[in-house]
Amino acid sequence: MNTQQLFREITQEQIKSDVPAFRPGDTVRVHVKVVEGTRERIQLFEGVVIKRHGGGISETFTVRKISYGVGVERAFPLHSPRVAQIEVVRYGKVRRAKLYYLRNLRGKAARIKEIRR
């Protein structure tokens, strides 16, 4: 067994199977496990997916939201044990894979059309 096969076998065990299908433009609610001292709690982060990057075990996605008038972006590893759950709230219709242009838009201009699924 060579190293590529070994690497593939190890990463296959770590990949989550309960990840919903979502794309850039979709609004998601990410349940993140946060450890504070000895306590562990779930923190929600809801926003628009502006990009997905990579593949396999190292795949990440970035979510953007506006909090108190300030844009906040957070990148999450898709298969991380810290990500407890991902819920798709809305499906958006966009024609780009990377939605960096949303960083420059404010208010109603930053809206994304919704697809009914």
Swiss-Prot record:
Q: Which GO terms describe its cellular component?
A: cytosolic large ribosomal subunit
Q: What SUPFAM superfamilies does UniProt report for this protein, alphabetically?
A: Translation proteins SH3-like domain
Under the heading Pfam families, the entry gives: Ribosomal_L19
Q: Keyword Protease: yes or no?
A: no
Keyword Secreted part of the UniProt annotation: no
Entry superkingdom: Bacteria
The record's annotation in InterPro entries points to: Ribosomal_bL19, Ribosomal_bL19_CS, Ribosomal_bL19_sf, Translation_prot_SH3-like_sf
One of the GO biological process terms: translation
Record keywords: Ribonucleoprotein, Ribosomal protein
Q: What does this protein do?
A: This protein is located at the 30S-50S ribosomal subunit interface and may play a role in the structure and function of the aminoacyl-tRNA binding site.
| Disulphide bonds in the chain | none
Family in the record: Belongs to the bacterial ribosomal protein bL19 family.
Record's protein name: Large ribosomal subunit protein bL19
Q: Name one GO molecular function term.
A: structural constituent of ribosome
